[in-house]
Amino acid sequence: MAYEIQEAKELVVKAGKELIEKGLIARTWGNVSARISDTQFVITPSGRAYEDLTPDEIVVVNIDDCSYEGDIKPSSEKGVHAAAYRHHPTVDFVIHTHQKAATIVSITGMTVTNVYDEFRGVLGDTVPCAKYAMSTTEPLRKNVEECIIENPSARAIMLMHHGALVMGDDYDHAFALAENLEACCDKVIKDNYLRHSWEKTYSDDAKRAYFLDKNGAGKMPESICDLGSSVRCSNTFTLTVGDKTLDVGTDNGVGVNGIAPKVEKIHRAIYNATGCTMIKHVTTPDVVAVSCTGEKMRPMIDDFAQIVGLDVKNEPWINGDTDECAKAIAKAAKGRNAVLIEGNGALVFGNTEGDIQALEIIMDKGCAAVVDCDIFNRPHYVPKAECFLMRTVYLAKYSKQIDE
């Protein structure tokens, strides 16, 4: 049964906060909707952070043509939600997420068949994957609708290179679908590693070791150089390395209140090359593992192409020759928001704390995708033309909108 409009709006706001708490979405990614009649639903607005949403900002949309009421623009994926309501009359709550494990499995393009018994009661027998099309586009809506029509019993579907769509009878059912889908896909990833490696038990460390050995990239480093984090203000930046913090001039690299460490050259070079105001060293295990390969990254996920760049270079850490190292890293940073440092993780850079948080999440998810899809032997990449379009649109519009 459809919700009353005010209850629907309040539940959509509540869902956004709960999805963040459960780690199924972040920042403004994904979207949530609730049916209010046979002809209308309410949905989250475009480009607004879930933490600050109010019921007054939730938009009423017509199922038939996706026209909407008011001055607030609805989510650009409203057509995907409309398709779910159109083809499933009993569905009253829809969530589109960019959840990690489901997104990684979506990259393979394969349907999850014979869903594990422990998840089958919620997910059904299969979880199909909609064919790829660029996010927010009419081709994506058509591909998702085609997948829904061809799999009428599926209430959870994956969107290739993108994320997942769950279609619940109500709020609780939608969340059960999203959580069971993530747990199911996580198990698919782990079981795939066990099949390929012939190991009897799973561990994250063993999986990364298998990935590195498979790619002739040695072993995970026993220690990682602290490349520091910093925040720029005008012609100086505050650099933190370990437990030490000092101010450094962006023009001359001179420490204002102490002797600047060698890594200041790298930070200064990135600031001068990109114009960013924040830099952070990311050393999550999957990011370190991918940095050990010495190979650049290409986008496997739409979010990565939009927010990080068309690729991410992997530059060697030349200990003791930091002028050359800083120059190479600065060159690799241009036009991007991250650079891998061989054997030492990555540096991400942006203009707000929100940018840095998003970049950390996406680099970690993107590197996990590199590891897992390599083991699947299905490293499918987002087409270059779509990467270019998404990156251009994001830089021009979306990144400005979320900071307003």
Q: Where in the sequence are the language-model features?
A:
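Glycine-rich flexible loops
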Residues: 1-404
